[in-house]
Design a protein with these regions (language model features):
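Active-site-adjacent structural elements in enzyme catalytic cores
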Residues: 1-335
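P-loop (Walker A) phosphate-binding loop of NTP-binding proteins
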Residues: 345
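Walker A/P-loop
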Residues: 351
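Short beta-strand-centered segment that lines the nucleotide-binding/catalytic pocket of NTP-utilizing
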Residues: 364-375
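Residue-level detector of conserved catalytic or cofactor/ligand-binding positions
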Residues: 386-392
Length: 392
């Protein structure tokens, strides 16, 4: 298949809209990431999204609309809290989940009885939706599991030859996918963090819950209520390990790891190859640059990456949510002491190894020396252990 490379002229957007109406796939920019769109009311077209991305069929899609009035036919009802969110955040980087109407098929909803709706604020996306004249189901326009594309060139790398057209609208403003909140539960629940933060949502509709899978691995057998919850996402080809620690501890650790790359803040001083993802005090810049940084790590041929852990509040929660999945939930916590026992015959280099481990911020223990102390009657270490375990 030849993939048309389109710009943002009225003629190009009209062609893209016509392709969508014909049941074909079109990638287009939004303020969050590039989306891979199909007519949401055409299940044959929607099924092509899953095939092009290699996406599991139980991973629901978000339906994009041009106007607020386009939402009503897609849902069974619009509760008062939804109206408040629409008034405050639509158009914008927020997705709201509501009970679906019969117009939305199970292919779009991932087999659920709900639908996720969003009205993007990106002017190119908005005009395309107007010209298409249909609601558009669109996940991120990347191969499933890889970092979401924030530039058209990354869409081309993943989707060229698989879809009808790519609309190049430049870089995405926010850089991470939309916030997702469900109102189909007794308590409104945040399912995916984004640029619209938990605090901003609560200012409009009161307290909301945060789904455990936002910050942790989803339980086996649990049904994904939102895109991005269940499967490994956002990951480069390299192995990523998330590192929790302050700037000094992080730098000391990564500088002792030969052959690794550092995915960190601009201010972090490291001697290993470094790919920054924003400033330490600016979580909006972290969100905007994260996926581009993950893609660059692949371009550089990185094999192992130690990523600096962001904070978990505000937009930082969105950055953490993406990074923890890119790392397949691997975390190295430098705030907890790591005790590493070292043993071996005299002359084996235990002292040298202990010094290297200490430089990495770890806590080596010469096990042979400890054992030697424990065999001496009345040794201070033996007395200390006796006091600790006196009841035994």
């Amino acid at each position: 298949m030849e993939t048309k490379q389109l710009g943002t002229t009225e003629q190009d957007l009209a062609l893209a809209g016509e392709l969508l109406r014909q049941g074909q796939l079109v990638a287009f920019p939004t303020e969050t990431v590039y989306g891979l769109g199909a007519d949401a009311l055409n299940e044959t077209a929607v099924a092509q999204i899953y095939a092009a991305k290699g996406r599991p069929s139980d991973n629901p899609l978000i339906v994009h609309v041009a106007e607020k009035a386009d939402i009503a036919p897609l849902v069974r009802e619009i509760p008062e809290k939804a109206k408040k969110l629409f008034d405050r955040f639509f158009p914008g980087p927020l997705t709201v989940i509501l009970p679906k109407s019969d117009k939305i098929g199970k292919v779009v909803s991932g087999g659920l009885d709900t639908v996720a709706v969003r009205m993007p604020e990106n002017p190119v996306a908005h005009r395309l939706l107007q010209l298409a004249g249909v609601p558009v189901a669109a996940p991120s326009a990347n191969t499933s599991g890889l970092p979401s594309p924030t530039r058209a060139k990354y869409v081309q790398e993943d989707m060229n030859g698989k879809i009808a057209a790519i609309v190049d609208g430049g870089d995405c403003a926010y850089g991470v996918e939309s916030t997702v909140i469900t109102l189909a539960t007794p308590t409104p629940t945040l399912l995916r963090p984004g640029a619209v933060t938990k605090e901003m949502l609560e200012a409009e509709i009161g307290p909301i819950a945060v789904a455990p899978a936002v910050l942790e691995k989803m339980a086996d057998g649990e049904t994904a209520a939102s895109p991005g919850m269940k499967y490994k996402h956002y990951a480069p080809k390299a192995q990523v390990i998330l590192v929790n620690g302050d700037s000094a501890a992080y730098a000391a650790f990564v500088n002792s790891q030969p052959g690794c790359y550092a995915l960190c803040y601009e201010e972090d001083r490291v001697t290993v190859p470094k790919v920054p993802y924003g400033k330490a005090t600016d979580d909006l810049s972290q969100a905007r640059e994260l996926f581009d940084a993950l893609r660059r790590l692949d371009e550089l041929g990185a094999k192992k990456v130690y990523a600096r852990m962001p904070r978990k509040t505000g937009v930082g929660m969105a950055v953490y949510n993406r990074l923890i999945r890119a790392a397949a939930f691997r975390i190295l916590d430098l705030t907890r002491p790591f005790l590493i026992g070292v043993t071996g015959p005299t002359g084996a280099g235990k002292g040298y190894v202990c010094r290297l481990l200490a430089q990495a911020g770890l806590h080596p223990v010469d096990c042979d020396r400890v054992y030697g102390q424990l065999t001496v009657p009345g040794a201070p270490l033996l007395q200390d252990l006796s006091l600790i375990h006196i009841s035994e």
